[in-house]
Amino acid sequence: MKKLAELLKTTPILRTEGATDIEILDVTADSRQVKEGSLFLCLEGAHVDGHKFVDSAVKLGAKAIVASKEVKATEGVTVVYVADTRKAMEDMVPFFFDYPSRKMRMIALTGTNGKTTTTHVVSHILEQAGYKTGVIGTIHALIGDKELPTHNTTPDVIDLERLLWQMAEEKVTHVCMEVSSHSLVMGRVEGVEFDNAVFTNLTEDHLDYHKTMDNYAKAKAILFEKVSSVGQTKGNKAAWVNVDDPYAHVMMDAVDQKVADLHTYSMSDKTADLYAFDSRFTGKSSAFKVTYEGKTYQFETRLAGRFNIYNTLGAIGAALSEGISMETIAAAMKTFHSVPGRFELIDEGQSFTVVVDYAHTPDGLEKILTTAQEITKGRILVVFGCGGDRDKMKRPIMGRIAARYADVAIVTSDNPRTEDPETIVKEVAAGVEEVKAEKPSLQVEVVVDRRSAIQKAISLAKGDDIVLIAGKGHEDYQILKDKTIHFDDREEARKALKQSARF
């Protein structure tokens, strides 16, 4: 609860019509969520203009309106005019919720792939060290073990600040948060003061939005500018960068080392602050050694694959900057199980391996396929597709990658949205066929219906084979042109295994 006059001091105002000595009980930019005593922010989006919903907001009890265009005045409702309502929101909302990010250690993780796993690993390490953590990310938000739904990798400003306020109220000490490039460019994290940031990697994705990889990298680098900006200090500030990534220098250049400590991690550069080597893999685990400050430590984790060693290194770095000892971190890694939909094993007693993974980018797909090569004696069967209304350039690229590594490539639908599923599948399959011309042993199947594609893969698999079902991971829905239906790759794989009963 804040006085409107207090809120107005946080942002530039053009003029005010009505009383400012009024209590504001809530803040929202969604007219459907207005309740008695709310402040309603009229945001202009790509498809919706909040100024058109002022009447609805007033009817539901809004006591104040923030607008950048003239709106109809209503008796008893204050109208505040600003040049930019989005900027006003970024200024006012963190203040309304008492700047919750200042009350907790804020750990941010960014990169194309690996954010979710790294975030959950950091949280697990901190919990094992005795802290109470909050998690905000692609799958969900967590306060301890309590799960809260989220709609974006990084929630919008109001939802995010409300969530952080709730975490602070519940005495969370550390927040582990995935930060997307979209959220950085769009200012969703503008009011958040970060203490610790990790860069996992940067590979082709979201180019429908960023247009070029350089723009994409600059968007990610905003986080490292933020973590090294002078704010309400809560102790040390740190940045951890995967120097094996070609865009590492962009992140490193963004760090002001007078404010934040810059650290590196690597699996190829022995001079990095954290260097992993002597790695060994099985289908269900990884073991490796890490050097840090002249000492060598042994690590064992149930996370399979080389890419998960990178994820673990990022998490180790973040935990070290929170004052956790290497011994505590190594012990915690032994008890970390997995993240839903991230190289998740589906076991119904079958003789072959089935894995569901969120890999939906060229790099992500290549990483799970190379991991499959490392741990599999038999064939690799991959079920994959590309999302509709998204970057079309990656479709043939992903087809080529799947064909290069797999023995059986099954192209199918993956959230076609408003596009024709068959058109998307053809564009992906074109990349597969390019490789097949040079790799005649490759078996190619085009099965537009995703359920049937999963069933096909299971029916073809034999002992020692691995079936990779890529693209959706934890998602339990399929987005079609006119509706969203329940669909979970893990459920479908289990059903197909039970129906085949070839154990």
Q: What kind of feature is each model-predicted range?
A:
Residues 63-69, 238-243, 383-384, 407-414:
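Short internal beta-strands
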Residues 45-46, 71, 181-182, 204-205, ...:
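Short glycine-rich anion-binding loops that position phosphate/pyrophosphate groups of nucleotides
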Residues 18-27, 89-92, 155-158, 177-183, ...:
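Short gly/ser/thr-rich secondary-structure transition/capping motifs
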Residues 8, 87-241, 249-259, 313, ...:
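Phosphate-binding loop of NTP-binding sites
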Residues 1-15, 36-39, 317-327, 331-341, ...:
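ATP-dependent carboxylate-amine ligase
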Residues 1-95, 277-280, 300, 304, ...:
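N-terminal leader/targeting and accessory segments in enzymes
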Residues 48-52, 186, 208-215, 391-394, ...:
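Glycine/threonine-rich flexible loop motifs
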